[in-house]
Amino acid sequence: MVIENDQIPISMIHAAFYPDEKMIWIEGIRVDKNFRKNGIAQKMISYLEKTAKSKNCKISRMLIASENEPSLTLAKKIGYKIISKWNYFSLESKLIDEEIGITSDTCIDSIDSFDKKNSHFIESWRWIPLTDQRLKKLNSEKKIFCQKDNEKIITLGIITESKSFENTIILELVSGANSEKMIKFTQNLAHQKNYSKIRILTELESLPSIKNLENKFPFYLMEKKL
């Protein structure tokens, strides 16, 4: 969606609809600096929310960097709430010549293993509710990996090939008593698939000390009931 003034673009916004999850994802809000006090961003979001309601969407979500105070203030003003904080790390792929003990077999038998309200699948930097249907699809595609101790899952991750970043694999680190092994497994997997970059997204506040692991910046996942 683009708004023009005298045939010159002054603002834009993008949205993606997820009918199965009854969700709209809003991103890419840009407003020319000369028009930022005109309430254009709020009007664009409101228009998309109305469109989402007409499509039977029940929630609207967006992701905002923690240091972006103007966007956070606007989102809160129009009814969005922070539902979680996510940390972003980057790492290079690497050949790991050791037995790590990560598997994709029988990691998830049921969505009951998750807190449905707070579980997400990250696709192209969009946080999608992890429904039972979505979970089964990921499991069948062998994108869910885990480390077990006496048949109990102690580390859980979702690994996907990024559609947003070139030559990149995404590790969503869901939980981890020993996340180092999951990270090393992802490094090795990326190396095998000829990817050079890894992006790690997690609610965990810190990760093990691994060479070249860079802590980028945190984001807030915002949500509004429609």
Put a short name on every predicted segment.
Residues 2, 8-16, 25, 151-162:
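Conserved beta-strand in the GNAT
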Residues 78-165:
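Amide-forming acyltransferase catalytic core, primarily the GNAT-like/NAT-type
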Residues 24, 45, 52-67, 74, ...:
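Conserved GNAT acetyl-CoA-binding A-motif
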Residues 17, 63-64, 81-94, 214-225:
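Conserved catalytic-core motifs of GNAT/GCN5-like acyltransferases
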Residues 180-226:
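Non-catalytic C-terminal interaction regions
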Residues 28-31, 37-51, 73, 77, ...:
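Conserved acetyl-CoA-binding loop-helix of GNAT-fold acetyltransferases
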Residues 42, 66-84, 204-217:
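Conserved active-site alpha-helix within GNAT-family acetyltransferase domains
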